[in-house]
Amino acid sequence: MKGLFISGSGTNVGKTFVAQYLIRLLSNTLKVSARKPVESDCENKNGRLIPKDALLLSKACNINEPIDKVCRYKLESCSSAQMASQDSGLKLTLDDLVDACMSDEFVIVEGTGGLLSPIARQALNSDLIQALDMPVVLVIKDELGAVNQALLSINSAQSCGLSISMLVLNQIQPNFLKNAQAIKQHTDIDINVFNQNHLASFERKVKKILLVI
C-alpha cells in the first residue's frame, strides 16, 4: 500500500491542514484516499459522533468514500486515543488500526497527537507507522520552541527506524524566528516552511517524494 503518514510534534500543530493540502495537490495526478483510523474529541450530534478532522480530509479527496471508512473509530472523550477508547469500553488494538488504514488507492493517513502519542493498547503512533511501513511527513508548528520540538521528534522517529520524507514548519502567522535555518544546522532532513509564500517550493518537494515512494 502506497501512501504518506502525517504526524507531528503534538496536537494542534496543523496536521489536518497540511494533510488537506497534500490530498488536493496529489489528487491532480492520483486517486487519493484519506484515513484517520481513530479520532477522539468527536462531537456528539443526536447520538452520532462526528469526526471533525476526518470530515475535512474526506472533503479534500477526489474519490467518495463513506466517513466510516475514512475514520473507523470515533471517540467522544477529549483525551489520547488510547484513553478515549478505554473510556468508551473499546479494546482497540494496533491490528485494528492497521486494518482501518487499508486502501486500494494512494492513501494519506493522519495520526492523532504526536509520534509517541498512545493510540491503542500498548501501541503508539510510531508503532502504527512501522506496521504500515510508510514514510512520514512531520508537521511542526513554526513558533518559539519549534527547534526543540523538531529535533525531539526527529530523534524519536529515527530511534524507531522511521523514514521522514519531509519536515513541515507550519507557519500559521508570519514570523522572523528563522527556525528552518536553525533546524537545518542539526539534520539533513528536508525542511519546508509551509505558508502562502512557499507553496511552489512545497509542491516541488512533494512531487520529488512521490518518485521514491
Curated annotation (Swiss-Prot):
Localization recorded for this chain is: Cytoplasm
Keywords assigned by UniProt?
A: ATP-binding, Biotin biosynthesis, Cytoplasm, Ligase, Magnesium, Metal-binding, Nucleotide-binding
* Residues where ATP binds: 12-17, 53, 110-113, 170-171
What Gene Ontology cellular component terms go with this record?
cytosol
Catalytic positions are 36
- Cite a single GO MF annotation: dethiobiotin synthase activity
* Top enzyme class: ligase
Q: Which cofactor does it need?
A: Mg(2+)
Pathway assigned to this chain's UniProt record:
Cofactor biosynthesis; biotin biosynthesis; biotin from 7,8-diaminononanoate: step 1/2
Which Gene3D superfamilies does the UniProt record give? Answer: P-loop containing nucleotide triphosphate hydrolases
Question: Which biological process terms from the Gene Ontology are attached to this UniProt entry?
Answer: biotin biosynthetic process
- The SS bond pairs are none
Q: Where is this protein chiefly located? A: cytoplasm
For the ligand (Mg(2+)), the binding residues are: 16, 53, 110
Per the record, the coiled-coil ranges are none
In which domain of life is the source organism classified? Bacteria
Q: Which family does it belong to?
A: Belongs to the dethiobiotin synthetase family.
The cross-references to HAMAP family, in alphabetical order and at most eight, read:
BioD
According to the record's subunit comment, the protein's assembly and interactions are:
Homodimer.
User: Which PANTHER family does the entry link to?
Assistant: DETHIOBIOTIN SYNTHETASE (PTHR43210:SF5)
Q: What does this protein do?
A: Catalyzes a mechanistically unusual reaction, the ATP-dependent insertion of CO2 between the N7 and N8 nitrogen atoms of 7,8-diaminopelargonic acid (DAPA, also called 7,8-diammoniononanoate) to form a ureido ring.
Name of the featured protein: ATP-dependent dethiobiotin synthetase BioD
